[in-house]
Swiss-Prot record:
Keywords: 2Fe-2S, Disulfide bond, Electron transport, Iron, Iron-sulfur, Membrane, Metal-binding, Mitochondrion, Mitochondrion inner membrane, Oxidoreductase, Respiratory chain, Transit peptide, Translocase, Transmembrane, Transmembrane helix, Transport
Organism: Drosophila melanogaster
Transit peptide endpoints, chain numbering: 1-35
PROSITE patterns listed in its UniProt record: RIESKE
Lineage: Eukaryota, Metazoa, Ecdysozoa, Arthropoda, Hexapoda
Name listed for the protein in its UniProt record: Cytochrome b-c1 complex subunit Rieske, mitochondrial
Subcellular location: Mitochondrion inner membrane
Entry function: Component of the ubiquinol-cytochrome c oxidoreductase, a multisubunit transmembrane complex that is part of the mitochondrial electron transport chain which drives oxidative phosphorylation.
Gene3D superfamilies, per the entry: Rieske [2Fe-2S] iron-sulphur domain, Ubiquinol cytochrome reductase, transmembrane domain
Pfam families: Rieske (PF00355), UCR_TM (PF02921)
GO CC terms of this entry: mitochondrial inner membrane; mitochondrion; respiratory chain complex III
Transmembrane region(s): 68-85
Cofactors that this protein relies on: [2Fe-2S] cluster
UniProt cross-references to PANTHER family, sorted A to Z: CYTOCHROME B-C1 COMPLEX SUBUNIT RIESKE, MITOCHONDRIAL
């Protein structure tokens, strides 16, 4: 009897197991539905491609032309960059250059052989006119013999020159700052047309409203034919 019961239990278990497997098989089949789309189109960019590169199997006949264009663009960019760099470098160097105040203190070198005897030449120095006069022997003699007692601003001629033949003065009238005219006036030196001041060939005031002689700047003669002012 026990054998019959055992066989019945086994058959029941097999039926349950078989039923479970069938149910599980139905569940698996229900989850395996395909969700993929088969009507998608592969993107085609042929309309945007140049004719020369549409066929990848064909030899590219325009490669050299396109390379030349690329080289041209790179070269143009390099030239533009060089000009931009040049501007930046010039600006940087300009910011490091001497200021106007420093330049105003600069010296000036004058070649004396360019000034003939008896002539007065004007240069620009520190923003002002500079008179360089190559005096004649007669002018030197005349100015040396002037009594200082007769002068408004007493000063002997040898106090105003380093070399007798060269007079170096700033060409600004000591009255109101006008620029005198060379080789003019009652004393043949300088004449200020603004208010009528007369200076002699030593730059000393002789007549008119100017209170002082023309200023003599610092200068030297490093050699026989060169004058350095400043």
């Amino acid at each position: 009897m026990m054998n019959a019961v055992s066989r019945a239990y086994v058959r029941g278990g097999a039926q349950v197991l078989s039923t479970g497997l069938k149910a599980s098989g139905v569940a698996v089949n229900s989850m395996a539905n395909r969700q993929a789309h088969t009507d998608l189109q592969v993107p085609d960019f042929s309309a945007y491609r140049r004719e020369s590169v549409k066929d990848s199997r064909r030899r590219n006949d325009t490669a050299e032309e396109r390379k030349a264009f690329s080289y041209l663009m790179v070269g143009a960019g390099a030239v533009g960059g060089a000009y931009a760099a040049k501007g930046l470098v010039n600006t940087f160097i300009g910011s490091m250059s001497a200021s106007a105040e420093v330049l105003a203190m600069a010296k000036i070198e004058i070649k004396l052989s360019d000034i003939p005897e008896g002539k007065s030449v004007t240069f620009k120095w520190r923003g002002k006119p500079l008179f360089i006069r190559h005096r004649t022997a007669a002018e030197i003699e005349t100015e040396r013999n002037v009594p200082t007692s007769t002068l408004r601003d007493p000063e002997a001629d040898d106090q105003r020159v380093i070399k007798p033949e060269w007079l170096v003065v700033i060409g600004v009238c000591t009255h109101l700052g006008c620029v005198p005219i060379a080789n003019a006036g009652d004393w043949g030196g300088y004449y200020c047309p603004c208010h009528g001041s007369h200076y002699d060939a030593s730059g000393r005031i002789r007549k008119g409203p100017a209170p002082l002689n023309l200023e003599v700047p610092t200068h030297e003669f490093p050699n026989e034919g060169l004058l350095v002012v400043g």
